[in-house]
């Protein structure tokens, strides 16, 4: 296809060629222009013309009506722009610019324009070097000479090209400048800038330079809306400037996430033809919305994911069902609590003393707490049973408890504190650490006789708290000290706060102490004390302090001025449903202590502790068969490691303490008989609390605080319950063959509590001893009336209470020939008084 050149353009090129040929210094034409070529070099013979074109590429030979001819015309327009020489070809020039253009064109023609001369290299000459390629030009070869470059400078025909564009100089027209040859376009650009928009030489004083090129001020504008971009922001697209608005509307990408334009100022993420805003909300996982910035991602079906689970539509942190998710949540929480406890226990052991001091000070209640409200709350809290609390135990782990392992807890609690706690539990350790390691653990603290009395009240309570997993356990409050706590100078500095039980699944897996729990309390009178009791000066004082001791162990020294108490762990009750019931009414199903009766006198707890031991020998089997109903308090108890389960005179002999006194039955609470509501054996005399509002107990807290000072100088007596428990335990060990378990429980001094310790063995073997049903406090007496006054004020008496006289106690215990020392610690003090044999209580 032949493109016909417009007539006007053809006349223009012909005129330009005439002007260039007239002003050039080339040789004269040969006069024999060949008709087959559109243009031939002037002054050559026909054979020389063929020789010249034979040196050029075939596609560039300007045969008539050939591609070479079209290339020639194109190169003439490109290398010799008409608007560089003629004003009429320029679009918008003012008069000054027109004058400059004429001067510029005439100067170039006069100083730089020329045409190459093609002739054979003389044979007589040895040869020459091509200026462009450096090749040899031999004699007789066709060479191109440029008169402006000098007579000795020559080129091969294909090497006569522009220095800038390396294109053959059309019709051998060149412009010489500084020893180099140029085409007309690039020579003009060496002298003046050319506008990238209109392709004209810029003769104005100002221009815009951008992207390495130059524009007229008015020509640098948006290619779409023609807005002048001088001094403005622009975007180049395919060599054309665009304003920001036009570029966004024409070329901006859409975000695959939010379907909005990705602005030029916004970061962009691109993958496989997709585009996203470079933000965490857009470039994120399509399933879980996790940010993928700087992270590997998984493309799938036009979306990106963070993992294979998300690409499959699964929840990587979820479970298969809601039921398993609930169970897993509890299991994970339990393991987390256990792991935190073990790890923290390892790190806190070097700083035990400092930590214990901090715990004592941090757990004390502020002085602005209402004592009456506090005591009422304590009573209500301690009476809660697991069946009334619907919160599972794993939810109560959110409280800021201080966890620790069992070895650390053994050195952070006082036996006197923990014996009165309502949730004490001891672990059954069948392994080597169960019986052999515990005496060694306690030996380092009790080997020194000078320290034994004070260490008896130091912190060694951790062994009580062997964690047990029970889903229906009530949530427990962290123990606190009462509002009137004061540090005793004779106490050990290692006494810490009571630790809340935690789960021990990790220990169970690692082969530590067994987490199989003994859920019944061990009766105090069935244990053998293997260390000295605390002195009287360090024991709690005040008869009404049984209110605090029923919920937390109170330690009073120096006449009650320096008293330290620890609140035990409680379960929150529904106060609206208690109807004024006192501490352990719901917990008295298994013969637990009646807290409301203990507040009656200064030593009311002692008789209950000695009498309750025969009523707490069954627990675990009943709990297993009835796990959701009202649970006995025994299920929360544990034996301290300082108790020695001995077949000897268990619970009745205290080394080094002869002046021990047991309070009369008038000072001890009596329990009303109640019947079991289950399908097992019935015990005719069960403990049941009388309904008495907890406010009545709290109101008399101050009046009975010093009642214990009157009861210090009484002669020692023995308790019948101690000897009965000794006979029972020895017959039990002989029948069961478990005499080797005497060291299963450690040593601990006697203390008082409204809540009895549980017998871990009795809970497991309770059905074997169910026939030993008896009660030591079912007799009546009026002797308590003599004790009912303190400082001239009557001590409030609970309704429907009966007390056993001291004569009855003496009658009950005189026939057993008990040793002179009896270890029944009531209200934390040691007292001894002769008792009469009970008139009404007999052994069944």
UniProtKB/Swiss-Prot annotation:
Ranges annotated as biased composition (Basic residues): 682-692
Tissue specificity statement from the Swiss-Prot or TrEMBL entry: Expressed in brain, eye and testis. Additionally in fetal brain, adult cartilage, pancreatic islet, gastric cancer and uterus tumors.
Superkingdom of the source species: Eukaryota
Basic and acidic residues bias: start-end ranges: 693-709
Residue ranges annotated for the PET domain, each copy included: 18-126
Effect caused by changing residue 148 to H: Found in patients with severe progressive myoclonic epilepsy; uncertain significance; results in increased protein activity
Domain LIM zinc-binding: 128-193, 193-253, 253-317
Keywords assigned: Disease variant, Epilepsy, LIM domain, Lipoprotein, Membrane, Metal-binding, Methylation, Neurodegeneration, Neuropathy, Nucleus, Phosphoprotein, Prenylation, Repeat, Zinc
Cross-referenced Pfam families: LIM, PET
Propeptide: 842-844
Stated name of the protein: Prickle-like protein 2
Organism listed in the record: Homo sapiens
